[in-house]
C-alpha cells in the first residue's frame, strides 16, 4: 500500500504546478454548475415534476460533479501511448500492479481536481439547499457505501475499456464511448426519473446507473434505506464481473504484446 500511496501523493502534487489551468478549470466547473442549475430552475421552478423538486436537482448536480471529477480518466489513451512508444515494457517491470498504479495515479490527480473544482461548487450549492430537509442517517450511510462502490465501478469501466488499447492501434474514441454510455444510461445529465419506462428497464441491467444515479437515489430517500442492499449488491456484482473480465483481458493483452519504439 505504501508504494501506491507514494504514487497518489506525487500525482496530487504534480497538479499544483499548473495554477492557470487549475483556475480555468474551477471557473469552467462553476459555470457549468450555474448553467445546469438555471436550466433546472426554469424547468421545475419551486414546484414538483414527477416527484422531483429543485433542491433534489441541486443535490443531483453536486453529486454528479463530484463523481465525474473523481473518476475522470483516459486510460485507453494512456495505454495506447505507452504501447506505441515502448514505455509499456518498463511499466510492466515495476514491482507493482499496473492496474493499481493507474488507479493511484488517476485518483491522485483527480483528488486535487475535487478540492479545487467540487468544493467551490458544493459551497455555492449549499445556498440552494438551505431549506431542504436533512436526510436520514441510514440514507446517508447507504449513500456513502454506494458512492464508494460507484467510484470504483467507474474506474473498472474505464480500465476495462482502456485495455482494448492493447488490441486497437488508435483508440481515442473509447473514452468518448464510456462517457456517452455513462451519460445516457447512467442518467448523469438527465436523471433516469424522467426516462421512458423502457429505457429505465434497460438501465437496470447495465452498470452505468450504479455509478452516481443510485447513490443520489439513496441520499434523497427515493430508494429507502431498508432496500439499499439491492443497488449495493448490483454494484458489487458488476465490480466482480468487470474485475474478472479485465483480468482475462490483461493476461491476453500481455501475452500478445508487441512493443514498438523503445
Regions found by a protein language model. Give the residues of each.
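Hydrophobic transmembrane alpha-helices and immediately adjacent juxtamembrane helices
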Residues: 1-262
Amino acid at each position: 500500500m505504501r508504494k501506491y500511496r507514494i504514487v497518489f501523493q506525487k500525482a496530487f502534487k504534480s497538479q499544483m504546478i499548473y495554477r492557470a489551468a487549475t483556475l480555468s478549470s474551477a471557473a469552467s466547473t462553476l459555470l457549468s454548475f450555474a448553467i445546469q442549475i438555471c436550466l433546472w430552475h426554469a424547468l421545475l421552478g419551486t414546484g414538483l415534476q414527477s416527484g422531483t423538486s429543485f433542491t433534489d436537482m441541486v443535490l443531483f448536480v453536486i453529486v454528479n460533479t463530484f463523481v465525474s471529477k473523481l473518476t475522470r480518466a483516459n486510460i485507453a489513451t494512456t495505454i495506447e501511448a505507452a504501447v506505441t512508444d515502448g514505455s509499456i515494457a518498463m511499466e510492466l517491470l515495476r514491482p507493482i500492479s499496473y492496474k493499481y498504479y493507474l488507479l493511484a495515479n488517476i485518483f491522485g490527480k483527480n483528488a486535487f481536481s475535487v478540492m479545487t473544482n467540487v468544493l467551490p461548487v458544493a459551497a455555492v450549492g449549499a445556498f440552494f439547499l438551505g431549506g431542504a430537509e436533512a436526510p436520514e442517517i441510514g440514507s446517508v450511510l447507504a449513500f456513502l457505501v454506494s458512492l464508494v462502490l460507484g467510484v470504483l465501478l467507474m474506474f473498472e469501466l474505464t480500465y476495462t475499456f482502456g485495455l482494448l488499447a492493447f488490441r486497437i492501434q488508435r483508440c481515442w474514441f473509447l473514452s468518448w464511448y464510456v462517457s456517452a454510455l455513462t451519460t445516457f444510461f447512467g442518467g448523469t445529465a438527465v436523471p433516469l426519473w424522467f426516462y421512458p419506462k423502457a429505457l429505465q428497464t434497460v438501465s437496470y441491467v447495465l452498470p452505468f446507473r450504479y455509478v452516481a444515479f443510485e447513490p443520489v437515489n439513496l441520499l434523497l430517500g427515493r430508494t429507502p434505506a431498508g432496500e439499499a442492499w439491492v443497488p449495493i449488491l448490483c454494484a458489487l456484482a458488476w465490480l466482480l464481473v468487470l474485475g474478472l473480465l479485465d483480468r482475462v483481458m490483461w493476461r491476453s493483452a500481455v501475452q500478445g504484446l508487441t512493443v514498438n519504439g523503445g
